[in-house]
């Protein structure tokens, strides 16, 4: 045993009883009813300690702490600690002295909760010992450990709901951008009402497009409303500005340039 290993305390119970047990003649388990339970051979304190992989059951005096007996346990359950067949409060432990002599004695608890704690403390210790052994084996042989299998088994299928994915993508989509004109200006939507608004020039005035005077055309079925756009030749209108320069019928086009805002000024 290494010198660097330290001793830890796993469980302490203030009162336990020790009994002399008759030798077992057959392979059947021990029975506490065969002991003299009303006349224990010794009573005192119990401590379970651990040093490395070995646990030690120590029976000590309540007042002075003097060691009465000690039972080293290297495996649980095993021959070092056995439960009786007729009660959960009594056990048979194998004690040893420093000279290698061994003896089996009966160990009893006055409360079932103390007996439960005694049993669980030993179970937890040897569960930890088992884990440490597995970790040591994996460290020595890392390739021998279980490998993660992410493949599909025979007949295994999965389901993907594409409809829900499309709904989520549509809800999280960005709004469409407004169409822009050739000059980079955003086009405003048409006014509500279903009828396009018309602008009628004052009486006696004419519109000039590209230096030519034109008369406003009357659209059939419009109730006499005049159309804003002049009925000029497409070739001549294409050479002018996209909206055209509108001037009054004074005889000469306006020399003042109009701002290219896209709106008709009168």
Swiss-Prot record:
The modification Phosphoserine is found at residue 181. Keywords: Cell membrane, Cytoplasmic vesicle, Endocytosis, Membrane, Phosphoprotein, Protein transport, Repeat, Transport. One of its GO terms (cellular component) is clathrin vesicle coat. Residues 165-198, 245-266 are annotated as: Disordered. Pfam families: DUF1681 (PF07933). A motif (WXXF motif 2) lies at residues 263-266. Its main location: membrane. It is found in: Cytoplasmic vesicle, Clathrin-coated vesicle membrane; Cell membrane. Expressed in brain, heart, kidney, liver, lung, skeletal muscles and testis (at protein level). Residues 249-266 have a biased composition (Low complexity). The keyword NADP does not apply. One of its GO terms (biological process) is endocytosis. It comes from the Eukaryota. A motif (WXXF motif 1) lies at residues 243-246. Involved in endocytosis. The WXXF motifs mediate binding of accessory proteins to the ear-domain of AP-1, GGAs and AP-2 through hydrophobic interactions. Selective binding to the GAE domains of AP-1 or to the alpha-ear domain of AP-2 is tuned by the acidic context surrounding the motif and the properties of the second residue of the motif itself. Belongs to the NECAP family. Interacts with AP1G1 and AP2A1 components of the adapter protein complexes AP-1 and AP-2. Interacts with the GAE domain proteins GGA1, GGA2 and GGA3. This is Adaptin ear-binding coat-associated protein 2.
